[in-house]
Design a protein with these regions (language model features):
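Phosphate-group recognition and catalysis centered on beta-loop-alpha active-site segments
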Residues: 1-212
Length: 212
C-alpha cells in the first residue's frame, strides 16, 4: 500500500492485509552477502534517500538504514509476517536470484501460498514445476503463449494490455490474469468487467470500495 506506507516494507505488508488485500506483492533484491531483501530498485535513493546499491552492500550495512520509521526488510521477515494469511507474489528482479528465492520459500513451508513472478522468461523456465509461477510483461505480442509454454499459472500484463481479447485468450489457455498497476477505482471496475482475475494496486481500499 505505497499510497499510505512506504513500499516493500513490513508496515506496508501489514497494512495491505488489514485493509483486505487478497495477495501482497513484493520485489526481491539480493545483498552482496546473499541476503534476500525487499526492494523494487537496486538503489535505495528513491525509497530511503541514500545512494546505496543493494547488491554492493552487506545486510549488516543495510539494516542500519532508517527513514520515517521504516527500515529495509528481509524476505524471510516478510514471509514470517504473512504466514499464509494471504497469498504473496514475489517478483524476482534479477535472473540469478530465482533459485535462492525458491529455496527460502520452501525452507519456510510457504510454497502453497506464494507465487514467483518475473519479467524474465529464463527465471520462470528454471522454476517450472517447482512452484506457482507468473510471467510479468509490458509489451505484446506473444507473452501469453510464452507463459503457457513456460508452465505458468498466471500472466501479469500492464493494465493497458489487458484487453478483452487478451483476457479471453489467456483464460482459454487456463491462465489467470492479474493486471498492474491499477490505482483508479473505475479502471479496476472496467478490468474486472472484462474478466481479469485480479489487479495490482497501491490503493486496495479504493479499489475494493469501487467493486462493492
Amino acid at each position: 500500500i505505497p499510497a499510505k506506507e512506504l513500499e516493500n516494507t513490513l508496515q506496508s505488508i501489514q497494512r495491505a492485509i488489514e485493509v483486505g488485500a487478497d495477495i501482497v506483492e513484493v520485489d526481491i533484491q539480493r545483498t552482496r552477502d546473499g541476503v534476500l531483501v525487499l526492494s523494487h530498485d537496486e538503489n535505495l535513493k528513491r525509497t530511503f534517500r541514500v545512494d546505496i546499491n543493494i547488491r554492493e552492500r552487506s545486510w549488516e550495512e543495510l539494516k542500519k538504514l532508517s527513514k520515517d520509521g521504516y527500515s529495509p526488510a528481509r524476505l524471510e521477515e516478510a514471509l514470517e509476517l504473512v504466514g499464509g494469511r494471504v497469498g504473496m507474489f514475489l517478483e524476482i528482479k534479477h535472473p540469478e536470484d530465482g533459485g535462492a528465492v525458491l529455496e527460502l520459500v520452501e525452507s519456510m513451508g510457504a510454497r502453497d501460498w506464494v507465487a514467483l513472478i518475473s519479467f524474465y522468461p529464463e527465471v520462470i523456465g528454471a522454476l517450472r514445476g517447482r512452484v506457482i509461477t507468473g510471467l510479468v510483461y509490458a509489451k505484446p505480442p506473444g507473452s501469453i503463449p510464452e507463459a503457457k509454454k513456460l508452465g505458468c499459472s498466471l500472466v501479469l500484463p500492464k493494465y493497458t494490455l489487458a484487453t478483452q481479447k487478451a483476457v479471453d485468450f489467456a483464460h482459454r489457455l487456463k491462465l489467470f490474469v492479474v493486471a498492474w498497476t491499477v490505482n483508479e477505482p473505475e479502471k479496476a471496475r472496467e478490468l474486472f468487467e472484462r474478466g481479469v482475475d485480479g489487479v495490482a494496486t497501491d490503493d486496495v481500499e479504493g479499489v475494493r470500495k469501487a467493486l462493492r
